[in-house]
UniProtKB/Swiss-Prot annotation:
This is 1-(5-phosphoribosyl)-5-[(5-phosphoribosylamino)methylideneamino] imidazole-4-carboxamide isomerase. Coiled coil: none annotated. It comes from Rhodococcus jostii (strain RHA1). The keyword Cytoplasm applies. It catalyses: 1-(5-phospho-beta-D-ribosyl)-5-[(5-phospho-beta-D-ribosylamino)methylideneamino]imidazole-4-carboxamide = 5-[(5-phospho-1-deoxy-D-ribulos-1-ylimino)methylamino]-1-(5-phospho-beta-D-ribosyl)imidazole-4-carboxamide. Pathway: Amino-acid biosynthesis; L-histidine biosynthesis; L-histidine from 5-phospho-alpha-D-ribose 1-diphosphate: step 4/9. Pfam families: His_biosynth. Its EC number is 5.3.1.16. One of its GO terms (molecular function) is 1-(5-phosphoribosyl)-5-[(5-phosphoribosylamino)methylideneamino]imidazole-4-carboxamide isomerase activity. It is found in: Cytoplasm.
Length: 244
């Protein structure tokens, strides 16, 4: 089985951007989300990972624009950012996306999250945004600004709730081009039977090959963002390197 690559389109104020370590104000603009997403589709992506950063930070949303983008794409979309109640979840699913990624809601409102998982099953992935604090993996909430508790306790709870998939981000790596946290990915895979999508830190084709080496342990895919936008490699090159 080959590693699924999900090129990322992060959206702020109607524009595709990349942040460094998720910090507001560190964004670099890359034009229209529609053009970015269509470019990844044309380059061979099977999935595109689209994040509404305004919604994630709680400062507005790009919902209508993103619904239009999802509608134009022929490939599957994983939609993320600010999905934390029935209205935002139903609006996200109504775009026709393949699945949504819940983040903050899984930490702040576990009962609602459990209901969403029970109702929508495979349509729900949970984003585990992790930072190493005093030797322990802690979760980060709302746009990575708030504390979210212990990773392993939350993972055990979500497994019990029947979560179908986890998107694991080492926040300290995201947008830095410093390489993925393979140890964290392996530990999460060991702790759950659900498939894991890796996110954060990918800078080279070799990084993707290293993540692909964890497919047998449970890693299903990898989100790739800044490395593609910065021209470190092309999506066709990356797809060729990790195809089973």
């Amino acid at each position: 089985m080959s590693l699924v690559l999900l090129p990322a389109v992060d959206v702020v104020n109607g524009e595709a951007v990349r942040l460094v370590q998720g910090e507001a104000g560190s964004e670099t603009g890359y034009g229209s989300p529609r053009d970015a997403a269509l470019a990844w589709q044309n380059d061979g992506a099977e999935w595109v990972h689209i994040v509404d950063l305004d919604a994630a930070f709680g400062r507005g949303s790009n919902r209508e624009l993103l619904a239009d983008v999802v509608g134009e794409l022929d490939v599957q979309v994983e939609l993320s950012g600010g999905i934390r109640d029935d209205a935002s979840l139903e609006a996200a699913l109504a775009t026709g996306c393949g699945r949504v990624n819940l983040g903050t809601a899984a930490i702040e409102n576990p009962e609602w999250c459990a209901r969403a998982i029970a109702k929508y099953g495979e349509k729900i992935a949970v984003g585990l945004d992790v930072r190493l604090v005093d030797g322990e993996y802690q979760l980060r909430g709302r746009g990575w600004v708030t504390e979210g508790g212990n990773l392993w306790e939350t993972l055990a709870r979500l497994d019990k709730d029947g979560c179908s998939r986890y998107v694991v981000t080492d926040v300290s790596k995201d947008g830095t081009l410093t390489g993925p946290n393979l140890e964290l990915l392996a530990q999460v895979c060991a702790a759950t039977d659900a498939p894991v999508v890796a996110s954060g830190g990918v800078s080279t084709i070799d990084d993707l090959r290293a993540i692909a080496g964890l497919v047998d342990q449970g890693v299903e895919g990898s989100i790739v963002g800044k490395a593609l936008y910065a021209g470190r490699f092309t999506l066709p090159e990356a797809l060729a390197a990790v195809s089973g």
